[in-house]
């Protein structure tokens, strides 16, 4: 299995799209962000995966994908406080992150489902971390840095 570093070295899972294929994937990504009535968590997961797969930038595609997840979850009311830190999860389970991204890039229904499940786990872990931090702040035990 591959680690998170391998995903970053290759800048994404699967074959890197070029030219018209890249333009089409990016257009689809923009449309997906604005689709109404789509399940918010599924939309956020697919947007993240598409940033990894399309990789429009020379670096930072994974970070942009994780940022978009946080933005979409807040915008769509899934986690309106913005305190969930789901973007920490990939660093905690880098192999699972790389494997889930690879599964998505396979293009199979099973791969897409595996990715969405992974993203849901990341959101849950982020909510749990936010709760832990909020409790520490309330108890006066949280220290910066």
Task: Give the predicted meaning of each segment.
Residues 1-145:
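FIC/Doc superfamily catalytic core
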């Amino acid at each position: 299995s591959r680690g998170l570093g391998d995903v970053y070295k290759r800048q994404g899972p699967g074959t890197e799209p070029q030219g018209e294929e890249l333009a089409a994937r990016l257009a689809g990504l923009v449309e997906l962000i604005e689709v109404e009535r789509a399940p918010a968590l599924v939309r956020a997961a697919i947007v993240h995966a598409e940033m990894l797969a399309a990789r429009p930038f020379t670096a930072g595609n994974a970070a942009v994908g994780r940022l978009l997840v946080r933005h979409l979850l807040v915008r769509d009311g899934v986690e309106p406080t913005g305190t969930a830190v789901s973007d920490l999860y990939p660093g905690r389970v880098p192999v699972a992150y790389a494997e889930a991204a690879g599964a998505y890039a396979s293009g199979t229904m099973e791969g897409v489902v595996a990715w969405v499940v992974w993203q849901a786990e990341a959101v849950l872990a982020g909510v749990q971390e936010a709760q832990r931090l909020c409790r520490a702040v309330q108890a006066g035990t949280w220290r910066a840095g």
